[in-house]
Amino acid sequence: MEAKPRVKVVLLDIEGTVCPISFVKDVLFPYALAALPETLSTEWDSSSFLPYRSAFPPEHSSTPEALLSHVRDLMAQDLKIPYLKSLQGYLWLRGYESGTLKCPLFPDVYPAMKKWKENGAKICIYSSGSVAAQKLLWRYTAEGDLRGCIWNGVDGAEEIEGGYWDTVNAGLKQESTSYEKIAKANRALGEVGEWLFLSDNVKEVRAAKESGMKSFVVVREGNADVSVEEKNRQVLITSFREVEAMVEVTGESA
């Protein structure tokens, strides 16, 4: 019997892959919009808020009203602008800390992550949400604080924190060069062909495969439909439990 391909590193998307799209669209985004007016009113000149305000273009950060209007426009268009993502993470912090926000993971996610880590594999995250927002989400899940499951090594040569990636430190998720950069920064963990990227987005899966990574499309309730053409081209899974039917997820220490 032919041995299954080996995977040393699993790279995970978040929205639609480990948690429902509805948590982001219907819970996190509305929370940020609702919290923003009071934050602008009470923290406009505060040292903690200034870095987020200063990241916005001058024409949109001259007054609280201008910034609020710009944020509403960006979110209405679902644009993934880095300075917007950073601000959202700042706004979500209090919601997570107060217990108002808690990320509901799909039931197969944590057991799979736990098993992969126990087998010596490494787990990394790549999302359009900022690294700060990613860390909040994994800290405050319905399963508890799962940051310990995620690789937190630092590549000394490039001074990049290896476990969390977004569109700022990696690049756009539909470009193969972004996946090449992630694998190169963590080259001690395994060759690019020993990485597996899991995402609900077919275009991201294509880009990851172009870089040399393995990649599967994750099909979840509430996700966009996958075309018949792509179903014939891609490997589709409906649960992380299906991953090890196709690859062996294990690290050097296993």
UniProtKB/Swiss-Prot annotation:
Ordered alphabetically, the record's keywords are: Amino-acid biosynthesis, Cytoplasm, Hydrolase, Magnesium, Metal-binding, Methionine biosynthesis, Nucleus
Write out the residues that bind substrate: 127-128, 173
Entry keyword Transport: no
> Would you name any one GO CC term?
nucleus
Q: Which residues form a coiled coil?
A: none
Name the residues that bind Mg(2+): 13, 15, 200
Cofactor binding: number and manner:
Binds 1 Mg(2+) ion per subunit.
Q: In which pathway is this protein known to take part?
A: Amino-acid biosynthesis; L-methionine biosynthesis via salvage pathway; L-methionine from S-methyl-5-thio-alpha-D-ribose 1-phosphate: step 3/6; Amino-acid biosynthesis; L-methionine biosynthesis via salvage pathway; L-methionine from S-methyl-5-thio-alpha-D-ribose 1-phosphate: step 4/6
The record's Gene3D superfamilies line, in alphabetical order, gives: 1.10.720.60, HAD superfamily/HAD-like
Q: Reply yes or no: does the keyword Nucleus apply.
A: yes
The EC number of this protein is: 3.1.3.77
> GO:BP terms for this protein?
L-methionine salvage from methylthioadenosine
Q: In which family does this protein belong, per the annotation?
A: Belongs to the HAD-like hydrolase superfamily. MasA/MtnC family.
Q: Which HAMAP family does the protein's record reference? A: Salvage_MtnC_euk
- How does this chain assemble? Monomer.
Q: Which NCBIfam families match?
A: enolase-ppase (TIGR01691)
PANTHER family cross-referenced by the UniProt entry: ENOLASE-PHOSPHATASE E1 (PTHR20371:SF1)
Record-given protein name:
Enolase-phosphatase E1
